[in-house]
């Protein structure tokens, strides 16, 4: 489920969707910053503590749900202390994936006229820190499923050269939106597109 506001996550909401077998345990829950002071300047109507509570509720409702979010670095006024708080809280949240964006000034917005605009160099540095963090957290999350037989919706396949020989590789996603690649024959690839295939998952083979 994508682009959900934290306020949407309630016990009633979770009771309703857990009763549906068509809902995948993948949630994109809006965040933008993991520091309350920054969130306040962004005019967000939630705190990081409330966000953490919503994540806990989802994790109690589903087995190993994949929770993803968006984070903006370099919002006007974001100090080193605020960014450090964001990093610390994101480490605690341990999300499946973060889409990291550098704040970009847009004319006509309140943020564009705010004091203490952050330099491009600082934005780049902070972005790289979060990109490294999310890469590590994503790898750790996916490792939980290593050795498990996972149903994968196969979406496409490629033919690659491997030691001078053509090798066919199917690509698809699990219900948690984990990318899976599987080497097989051309015939199996053609038969499996837009179908579910059980795959013994090995993270190192899906890079």
PLM region spans:
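Ser/Thr-centric signal marking residues that sit
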Residues: 69, 78-79, 86, 109, ...
């Amino acid at each position: 489920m994508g682009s959900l506001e934290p306020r949407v996550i309630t016990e009633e909401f979770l009771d309703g969707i857990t009763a549906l077998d068509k809902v995948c345990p993948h949630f994109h829950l809006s965040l933008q910053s993991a520091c309350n002071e920054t969130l306040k300047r962004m005019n967000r109507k939630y705190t990081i503590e409330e966000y953490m509570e919503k994540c806990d509720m989802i994790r109690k409702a589903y087995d190993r749900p994949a929770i993803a979010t968006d984070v903006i670095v370099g919002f006007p006024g974001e100090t080193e202390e605020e960014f450090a708080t964001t990093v610390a809280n994101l480490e605690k949240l341990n999300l499946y994936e973060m889409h990291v964006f550098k704040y970009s000034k847009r004319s006509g917005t309140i943020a564009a006229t705010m004091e203490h605009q952050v330099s491009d160099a600082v934005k780049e540095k902070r972005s790289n820190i979060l990109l490294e963090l999310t890469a590590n957290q994503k790898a750790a999350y996916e490792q939980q499923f290593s050795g498990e037989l996972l149903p994968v919706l196969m979406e496409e396949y490629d033919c690659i050269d491997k030691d001078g020989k053509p090798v066919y590789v199917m690509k698809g996603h699990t219900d948690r939106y984990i990318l899976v690649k599987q080497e097989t024959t051309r015939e199996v690839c053609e038969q499996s597109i837009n179908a579910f295939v059980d795959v013994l998952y090995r993270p190192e083979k899906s890079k």
